[in-house]
């Protein structure tokens, strides 16, 4: 059954549209029940034609996540300046697919936390982390982010972001250079490539 385009869509009632769409869906269900053939059967030992590749859904999803990281910036101190340098034209962050920093954590999958975190600010870091959709990664930037840095013994400083949120990659330095941050992003890429979607 095909959709009837003799009448303009604006003149059809919702019931008529639903009925026609239901018929098309039902024809797909009944007409396309044969299983997808094994590639070995239709390739006959030959190479696939140009433009065709065979892979798993897991690899495709990891590939797309690898090349489209959407970072949210949580800059707290001097390390954030180096993060801004990395986003400038000299280091060309766009080649990693993350040229636009997101304003909302709900649109991001990578949080780059840079600088000194105080206990008063820690609940806000956790709140932003909780607002990010899965899968999500956290990159701790600088000595203050990894261990508290120069202010470690202060009563008000969190000695490492891992006490508040799970951290995937640490970037040492005070402040770390943009090259170190780019290396950490490549480490995140490697971690994404090894992510298992289906548990076996």
UniProtKB/Swiss-Prot annotation:
Q: In Gene Ontology terms, what is one molecular function of this protein? A: 4 iron, 4 sulfur cluster binding
Give membrane topology per the record.
Answer: Peripheral membrane protein
Annotated GO CC locations: plasma membrane; respiratory chain complex I
A single Gene Ontology biological process assigned to it is: aerobic respiration
What EC number(s) does the entry state?
A: 7.1.1.-
- Which segment of the chain is annotated as a signal peptide? none
Required cofactors, per record? Answer: [4Fe-4S] cluster
Top EC class of this enzyme: translocase
- InterPro entries xref list: NADH_UbQ_OxRdtase-like_20kDa, NADH_UQ_OxRdtase_20Kd_su
For this UniProt record, the keywords arranged alphabetically read as follows: 4Fe-4S, Cell membrane, Iron, Iron-sulfur, Membrane, Metal-binding, NAD, Quinone, Translocase, Transport, Ubiquinone
Keyword Signal appears in the UniProt entry:
no
| Origin superkingdom | Bacteria
Task: Write out the residues that bind [4Fe-4S] cluster.
Answer: 78-79, 144, 174
Q: What is its main location?
A: membrane
- Report the subcellular localization: Cell membrane
Regarding protein family, the annotation reads: Belongs to the complex I 20 kDa subunit family.
Q: What does this protein do?
A: NDH-1 shuttles electrons from NADH, via FMN and iron-sulfur (Fe-S) centers, to quinones in the respiratory chain. The immediate electron acceptor for the enzyme in this species is believed to be ubiquinone. Couples the redox reaction to proton translocation (for every two electrons transferred, four hydrogen ions are translocated across the cytoplasmic membrane), and thus conserves the redox energy in a proton gradient.
Q: Which NCBIfam families match?
A: nuoB_fam, PRK06411.1
Quaternary context: NDH-1 is composed of 14 different subunits. Subunits NuoB, C, D, E, F, and G constitute the peripheral sector of the complex.
Q: What is this protein called?
A: NADH-quinone oxidoreductase subunit B
Source organism of the structure:
Dehalococcoides mccartyi (strain CBDB1)
